[in-house]
């Protein structure tokens, strides 16, 4: 029997809509509860240092009401680690961050920032959080993740999602497959995410080594037309269908 592939729903862009007008709506807290009710296995949110979408208040309230688990994405900075120490998320994913980027542009470079990342991993683990590192599908970065003590990685699927030709997409899919196999051979839990949507998720979901996909923008965009609960259910259905064809 194939292992179930989990879905973490990222609700950042509910907050993006709210912050565009500085209103109190739409409410990320309500979105988190609706996503859970529709079958999300966890809620992912990224409180960026520039506070462009998710605010500290959102994180505090969501932590109080979640029935599943929180995956808090954060930059490797003292301020963000201090905040995590207040929240104590079940899962914490360290990500790279640039103020000028529209969205996360690539994976964390553990090789370059090993000492800083290692200290952050240890600090989060002392808080009781399971730590994940958001990295490119690169074997050297995967080895470095093991070296700094992270038990979980999240493979950056952005290059696959942004591919402009079938050849390029196939190449990037193979990179992700090989990276997932390599990471699993090192006893890492392997998640994936970034840029995944309803038309490209199935090949990724069919990778047997993957434990969880974190998806946000596509689900929130679909929700504008069919509602958030239906958007979450549809994504789960596609992921489950992909797993039916994976050999044990």
From Swiss-Prot:
- InterPro entries the record matches: Aldolase_TIM, PyrdxlP_synth_PdxJ, Pyridoxine-5'_phos_synth
Which UniProt keywords are given for this protein, alphabetically ordered? Cytoplasm, Pyridoxine biosynthesis, Transferase
- Positions of 1-deoxy-D-xylulose 5-phosphate binding: 12-13, 48, 53, 103
Annotated site (Transition state stabilizer): 154
CDD domains this protein is in? PNPsynthase
Q: Where is the active site?
A: 46, 73, 194
Q: Tell me yes or no: is Oxidoreductase among this UniProt entry's keywords.
A: no
Q: What is its main location?
A: cytoplasm
Against NCBIfam families, the record matches this protein to: pdxJ, PRK05265.1-1, PRK05265.1-3, PRK05265.1-5
On subunit structure and binding partners, the annotation says: Homooctamer; tetramer of dimers.
Q: What does this protein do?
A: Catalyzes the complicated ring closure reaction between the two acyclic compounds 1-deoxy-D-xylulose-5-phosphate (DXP) and 3-amino-2-oxopropyl phosphate (1-amino-acetone-3-phosphate or AAP) to form pyridoxine 5'-phosphate (PNP) and inorganic phosphate.
As for family, the record states:
Belongs to the PNP synthase family.
Q: What is this protein called?
A: Pyridoxine 5'-phosphate synthase
Q: Which organism is it from?
A: Legionella pneumophila (strain Paris)
